[in-house]
């Protein structure tokens, strides 16, 4: 036979989390986000997938691209013409790394 506290404690915890705690947190919530002055921040975060300026950054079911690195794709599309062009390209890459 199951002991009485093994039934009562889970039942009380369920009632607390589902009914009592949400009501109490409306009036007293020490975990609410606050600004530097201690005022409660009412505004939630913006939805990251809003269409601004007529352009949607996220299109569900849009084009799926393969995971190919950009450097490999650029080299295969635009191969260097000669050794001088290749040397100049490596110098530019090295200067970018130094900065």
Curated annotation (Swiss-Prot):
Modified residues (Phosphoserine): 69
Keyword Translocase set for record: no
Skewed-composition ranges (Acidic residues): 68-77
The keyword Calcium is annotated on this UniProt entry: no
Keywords: Phosphoprotein
Annotated stretches, region: Disordered: 60-99
Domain of life according to the entry: Eukaryota
Protein family membership: Belongs to the UPF0729 family.
Protein name: UPF0729 protein CG18508
Organism: Drosophila melanogaster (Fruit fly)
